[in-house]
Amino acid sequence: MNKILFIFTLFFSSGFFTFAVSADKNPGSENMTNTIGPHDRGGSSPIYNILNSYLTAYNGSHHLYDRMSFLCLSSQNTLNGACPSSDAPGTATIDGETNITLQFTEKRSLIKRELQIKGYKQFLFKNANCPSKLALNSSHFQCNREQASGATLSLYIPAGELNKLPFGGVWNAVLKLNVKRRYDTTYGTYTINITVNLTDKGNIQIWLPQFKSNARVDLNLRPTGGGTYIGRNSVDMCFYDGYSTNSSSLEIRFQDDNSKSDGKFYLKKINDDSKELVYTLSLLLAGKNLTPTNGQALNINTASLETNWNRITAVTMPEISVPVLCWPGRLQLDAKVKNPEAGQYMGNIKITFTPSSQTL
C-alpha cells in the first residue's frame, strides 16, 4: 500500500487551504487493525479514533471519486456493523455522521455487547476548501462547483461508549464496509479488526465463595495415637484478574504474621506466643499443584494453566453486573504435630494476588 503524505499550506488571508498528495491512490479492498487501550473501567472513557481522515482514494487528474460511499453489509445485523447498506435516495447530501452499531465479543467468555461507532466522510478538492462532514451513504458533494478528486474516511468510538462493556477483558469486533462509487461501481470492502483491551483494576480480587469477607478456618486437630495430632481443612477461592483471565502471568504471595524467615507457617497459642504449631499450605490452581513458601511469591505463567471450562470458572461478584471468569483454586492447610500443649492456637495468612493486568 502506498504511503500517503498530506502537506497543508495555510493561507489565513484568503480563508482556504490548498493541499498536495504525494501519490494518487486507487480505492480497493483493505484489511486494517486497530487496538484500543489498555483502558481501565475505573477511568474516564474518551473518544477513541479508529480511522482519522484516512485517505481512501485520490486522483488529481479526474473526478471519478466524487461520489464515493461507504456502506455496511447489513442495516440490521450487528456482527460486522449495522448501518445503511444502500445509498441515500436521490441526490441529497446528508451532512453529519453515520451511526454504526457493532457487536463486540469478549475473547474468553464469548459474552457479546453492542457499541455505537460513528463515521463520516470528507471529500477532497484541488482548488477549494469544503471540509464538511458527510454521512457515509450520502450523495456526491460539490464545493464552489468543483467536483471532488478524492475522499477520506473517519471512524471513532464516542466518549463514554466503552462504559457499556460490563467487565474487563479483550473485546474484539470486525467492522466491514463496502466501498462504492455511487450506484455503479464497487471498489472493494474495508475489513477493520478492532480490539479493545479493557482492564478492571478496581475489582482485582481473590473471591472466596464460602465467605462474605475474610475466611476463618479451623484445622480440626485430632489425635491419631502416640501423641501425634493431625488436622486438615481447605478453602475454595477464585482468582479474578479484572481481565477475564487474559493475564499472561500471576504472582501470588502467602505470608503470615510471624517474624521468622524459615519459610514455614505458624500458629501461636493464644496468650502465650512462645508456644507454636507448624502447618503447611498447598494450592491447587486450575489443575496445577503449588506449594507456597511463607513470604515468597509464586510466579505463574498462565500458559502453563489449563484453560478449558472445567478450570476457568464463571462467578457472580457483588460489584459486577454479570458473571465473570476467574481461575479456581483450593487452598489446603495441613498440620501434623507431636505432643502439642493444650489450648487454642491462632494465625493469620495474608494473600497478595498480582496479575499482569495490574500493570497494563
Curated annotation (Swiss-Prot):
It is found in: Fimbrium. Keywords: Fimbrium, Plasmid. This is CFA/I fimbrial subunit E. Pfam families: CblD. It comes from the Bacteria. GO terms for cellular component: pilus. InterPro entries: CblD, CfaE_adhesin. It comes from Escherichia coli.
